[in-house]
From Swiss-Prot:
Keywords: Cytoplasm, Protein biosynthesis
Organism whose genome encodes this protein: Brucella canis (strain ATCC 23365 / NCTC 10854 / RM-666)
Subcellular localization(s) per the UniProt record: Cytoplasm
Gene Ontology terms for molecular function: ribosomal large subunit binding
GN (gene name): frr
SUPFAM superfamilies linked to this entry: Ribosome recycling factor, RRF
Keyword Cytoplasm recorded: yes
UniProt-listed HAMAP family: RRF (MF_00040)
Name of the protein: Ribosome-recycling factor
Length: 186
């Protein structure tokens, strides 16, 4: 095979799309408490914006409770405000430098909304994988046109790129199915 085409680069980019999907899905609420639920929240602190995990420690003491231990007493109010304003429907209870966040039960309608959002994230991931595939196919066509690789090599590599894309999309579908099961679990 030709050294002019690097399928490992495409593989790395597709893995990046899968990791982005996992990260996005990690921010969706399920029936259980998870520290990743608070990861997208940013805090106005010390004149800049920073992720919550840079000003506090997040733990899960119970299945329906999150605990946020703020390191700097002056930041407790800002952290509490950011959690309330996050759009996650959470109401922290301040206890000194610790915020306890009880997670209410998700109702059926909210669960279905979260599943829809998960499917939107999955579609974004599939689109990203297809963009990587298109880039790879365009590269192959150019290499074939410039006579760097033969038509046979191009066809074999195209099949590899397509298989990589199919495998990546199947992995994404599996990840979303697991997340959907977690969300719908009562």
């Amino acid at each position: 095979m030709s050294d002019a085409f690097d399928i490992n680069d495409l593989k790395r980019r597709m893995e990046g799309a899968v990791n982005a999907l996992k990260h996005d899905l990690g921010g969706l609420r399920t029936g259980r408490a998870s520290a990743s639920l608070l990861e997208p929240i940013t805090i106005e602190a010390y004149g800049s914006t920073m992720p919550i995990n840079q000003v506090a420690n997040i733990s899960v003491p119970e299945s329906r409770m999150l605990s946020v231990s703020v390191w700097d007493k002056s930041m407790v109010g800002a952290v509490e405000r950011a959690i309330r304003d996050s759009g996650l429907g959470l109401n922290p209870i301040t206890d000194g430098m610790t915020l306890r966040i009880p997670l209410p039960e998700l109702n059926e309608q909210r669960r279905k909304e979260l599943v829809k959002i998960a499917h939107q994230y999955a579609e974004q991931g599939r689109i990203a994988a297809r963009h990587v595939r298109r880039d790879g196919m365009d590269q192959l066509k150019k290499l074939e046109k410039d006579s760097v690789i033969s038509q046979d090599e191009s066809r074999v590599l195209s099949e590899k790129v397509q298989k990589l894309t199919d495998d990546t999309i199947a992995e994404m579908d599996k990840i979303v199915a697991v997340k959907e099961g977690e969300i719908m679990q009562v």
